[in-house]
Amino acid sequence: MESLREIIDRVLPLLSYDPQAPMLFSSELFLFLFAAFAFFYGFMRRTPALRIWYVIAFSLYFYYKSSGIYLLLLVGVSVSDFWIGRAIAHVGSRRAQRALVALSIAADLAVLGYFKYTNFFIEIARDLFGAGFLEFQNIFLPVGISFFLFQSLSYTIDIYRGSLKPVDRWGDYLFYLSFFPQLVAGPIVRARDFLVQIRQNPIAVSREMFGTGIYLITIGLFKKAVISDYISLNFVDRIFDDPALYSGMECLAAVYGYALQIYCDFSGYSDMAIGLALLLGFRFPKNFDAPYHSATITEFWRRWHISLSMWLRDYLYISLGGNRKGRLRTYFNLLVTMVLGGLWHGSNIRFLVWGVMHGVGLAVVHAFHELKKRFWPDGFTPSPALHWCGVGAAWLLTFHFVSFLWVFFRAEDMERSLEILRRVFVFGQPGEGFPLLVIPAVLIGLALQLFGARLFAAFVDAQERLPWAVQAVVLALVGGFILKMGPDGVMPFIYFQF
């Protein structure tokens, strides 16, 4: 028998926050806790009030394990925007509504600005006025702050625009903002799509939802633990840490490797988030749709991080005027939107470069389509051979444009970003050798891009024929096998830092 002290020692880590070990979907601890949580959740199908607060409690616990005391910030934002949303709906004056939505935007952006950009502006001030002008601040960045603040902003803005009615209960709004599957890295869920699902009675999980959820959790775990983490630890990290040690071909392979790593990491998280939500009876929007199939930058942003792309379009690009104010203004709006999208990821010159280049890419594609309309107003129908050659060339150009810009996203500083690009385009430098064991992981990742939809359909079809209990056992066995296949230890998801 364990002594009381031994039991306490085993339980304490579950109740304490460790900044070096945030709770991750891909950890054995989370999967075990979720299984226990889901078991009791099943008994609350017909009790909405109890179910809502049960989920809120687990969500806040999950966030506490990720960001500690900053769960109070999450709760504070929910209180603030809940009451501002209700005030916007009930005041009669449009001027008062405008002031209230401005207050919400200013408060949320001030919170985001403090945590993400304080040291960025201090660095600028030190460059202008000298190193002794200001000291850098040791500011902890709460996990997922950009995601839940964007969700909260969309809520008050939609009420102001008249496209959404405010919720009557604060608990419902806290549920929406804190729901653990999407809390720390999206998808960015719109209030109008999610709030109507909260008080389902009874909560409905169809066989199709259950099978799809299990597939998405399994494939997301595989993408993260087996492909992304393996490529990162065994190849990509080594080259990006010190590119001067590697040849141009090895640096090019690392560029391709990181393009695959970030896709498998982020889409793997999104798959798991959507799958977990489905098992609980909630539907999230798709967040990735084979983005590396894209033949233009515009198409890429319709397929990559779809919830963020749609948010930037609806609340920033359209608010700036969209394409309604002339060609030059359209290009300007695209550039501003992508620059701010880049800075949303982080306060660093690398993200600024990344955003500027994507904005330029979108503007160039838009200008190309305008020219095509001018020269071929009735349309242009090339021969099949010419069509496929053009599509292939466009895909190749788009893929490399996106992949090389990921270098700025991944490298620790501009110096290493430029060193990798220099070595890629100046061949002949000696290197340490390409690790052949990485190749299978790369090939599997590419296969998921090409055949993911077919695999999904086949898996769900097979799963739906099995009893629910068998499906749960399959998930547990496959999940355990995947975790054993992956590297030792669990690496944080890349988008946790945003």
Question: Where on the chain are the PLM-derived regions?
Answer:
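Membrane-embedded transmembrane alpha-helical bundles that form the catalytic cores
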Residues: 2-446, 452-497
